[in-house]
A protein has these predicted regions:
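Interdomain hinge/linker elements that couple catalytic modules in large macromolecular machines
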Residues: 1-73
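A cross-kingdom feature that marks ATP-driven nucleic-acid transaction machinery
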Residues: 60-188
């Protein structure tokens, strides 16, 4: 239905918190929670928590970020669905140039984060990392985010990573920025 399409579109466009989805769709929060629950059960959306979130935090409906699980679905609802009239009218070139091309690097960066996590999971299974991690995901607090954090069971060893899908080369400045984020994580 149009309600579900609006919710999926909102999430695909980067509105990943419950309140952001509510603001974008203007759906009453109590009803929105039911729709989101249905989309989670169908596997269309998933809910992501900071890698350091405990079970109590994960049980809180207000916590976590929603994400479209399938990259094709995510692309469709981010670029095709909101522009379907123009595309049906034959303006694929204009939509690509003025909509898709402008957002493609940002969109692809989220997909690249998933690819990087998959790569680390594979390396972990093959025991090719300095330690075996038991948990991997993104870490965030109210002001900062780390794209990848992997920790061992004892939480004594950690891998941090920033996933940059961009034209420019990663440099020392990027490394120092990640090191500063590591110190933020150590405070929590």
């Amino acid at each position: 239905t149009s309600v579900y399409n609006a919710i999926i579109e909102a999430v695909a466009l980067g509105n990943t918190k419950l309140n952001d989805i509510h603001q974008k769709t203007q759906i009453e929060k109590s009803k929105l929670s039911v729709y989101l629950k249905n989309l989670l059960e169908l596997g269309i959306l998933c809910k992501e928590f900071s890698v350091d979130a405990n079970i109590k935090e994960q049980a809180n409906v207000q916590r976590g970020l929603y994400k479209v699980t399938d990259n094709f679905f995510r692309f469709w609802y981010a670029f095709v669905f909101p522009n379907i009239s123009e595309l049906e009218a034959g303006d694929a070139e204009g939509i690509y140039k003025y909509v898709v091309e402008r957002e493609l690097e940002r969109y692809t960066s989220y997909v690249f984060e998933d690819v990087c996590q998959q790569y680390l999971r594979r390396q972990n299974r093959l025991h090719l990392l300095p330690f075996y991690f038991t948990k991997i995901g993104r870490w965030w607090n109210k002001t900062d985010e780390i794209d990848i954090m992997a920790v061992n069971y004892q939480k004594t060893d950690i891998i941090l990573g920033e996933c940059k899908y961009k034209q420019s080369v990663v440099d020392v400045k990027d490394l120092k920025h990640l090191q500063a984020k590591q110190s933020l994580n150590n405070k929590n």
